[in-house]
């Protein structure tokens, strides 16, 4: 069983509520089969809660009730599965191109009984038109200049991108500003999330998208 500190437990209880047992089970999947199949490095096991699960799950506070969420490059389900557990009101599509990861994700979804999750094997750019999303999430996929092109088109013209980023978020926004505007991004900001829950809060880039409709 993966150890959880008192502070991490308090944060997890706040975020997951009565679904905390599902979150714990998910963490066990990450620590066992997730590590065995190369989705998570073995050195990450002691910090699965702090660096991965809680770090991702806190962004649920930024997602409107009942949203359809597409998680790009879902990998080990970070943040997609964290959001599905914390927020049963959300409808999640996990977009992941690698078959071995897709198989693992589906196994975890089935084991946890998450009926608000669809796992899709696809590259993000090929999923456009096949996914309906109000919010697109991503973590550690690529630089924001590239990430904008992978995420914004999935919104179909309006919605939000919420990307978990590091300390260079502001610098990335400057470099990506032109690409974001071209794709329909009207407002881009850096947010700090979970500062009242986590020792190291999560930095996210939020892109509000409202692409003008083409005149017929």
UniProtKB/Swiss-Prot annotation:
First and last residue of the signal peptide: none
Coiled-coil region: none
Amino-acid positions noted as binding S-adenosyl-L-methionine in the UniProt annotation, renumbered to this chain: 73, 78, 124-125, 139
Presence of the UniProt keyword rRNA processing in the record: yes
GO molecular function: rRNA (guanine-N7-)-methyltransferase activity
Annotated TM spans: none
Keyword vocabulary terms for this entry: Cytoplasm, Methyltransferase, rRNA processing, S-adenosyl-L-methionine, Transferase
Chief subcellular location: cytoplasm
Location in the cell: Cytoplasm
Domain of life: Bacteria
The EC number(s) this enzyme carries: 2.1.1.-
One GO cellular component term: cytosol
Functional description taken from the UniProt entry: Specifically methylates the N7 position of guanine in position 518 of 16S rRNA.
Cited PANTHER family: S-ADENOSYL-L-METHIONINE-DEPENDENT METHYLTRANSFERASES SUPERFAMILY PROTEIN
Family: Belongs to the methyltransferase superfamily. RNA methyltransferase RsmG family.
Protein name as catalogued: Ribosomal RNA small subunit methyltransferase G
Organism (species): Pseudarthrobacter chlorophenolicus (strain ATCC 700700 / DSM 12829 / CIP 107037 / JCM 12360 / KCTC 9906 / NCIMB 13794 / A6)
Gene name in the database record: rsmG
């Amino acid at each position: 069983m993966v150890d959880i500190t008192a502070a991490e437990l308090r944060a997890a209880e706040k975020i997951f509520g009565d679904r905390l047992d599902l979150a714990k089970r998910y963490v066990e999947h990450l620590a066992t089969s997730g590590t065995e199949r190369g989705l998570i490095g073995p050195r990450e096991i002691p910090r699965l809660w702090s660096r991965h699960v809680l770090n991702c799950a806190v962004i649920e506070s930024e997602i409107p009730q009942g949203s359809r969420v597409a998680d790009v490059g879902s990998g080990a389900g970070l943040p997609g599965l964290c959001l599905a557990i914390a927020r049963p009101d959300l409808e999640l599509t996990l977009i992941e191109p690698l078959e071995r990861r897709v198989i693992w994700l589906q196994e975890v979804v089935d084991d946890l009984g998450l009926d608000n999750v669809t796992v899709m094997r696809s590259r993000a750019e090929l999923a456009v038109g096949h996914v309906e999303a109000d919010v697109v999430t991503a973590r550690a996929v690529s630089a924001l200049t590239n990430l904008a092109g992978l995420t914004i088109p999935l919104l179909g013209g309006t919605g939000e991108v919420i990307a978990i980023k590091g300390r260079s978020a502001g610098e990335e926004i400057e470099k990506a500003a032109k690409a974001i505007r071209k794709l329909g991004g009207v407002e881009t900001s850096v947010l700090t999330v979970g500062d009242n829950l986590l020792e190291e809060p999560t930095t996210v880039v939020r892109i509000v998208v409202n692409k003008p409709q083409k005149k017929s």
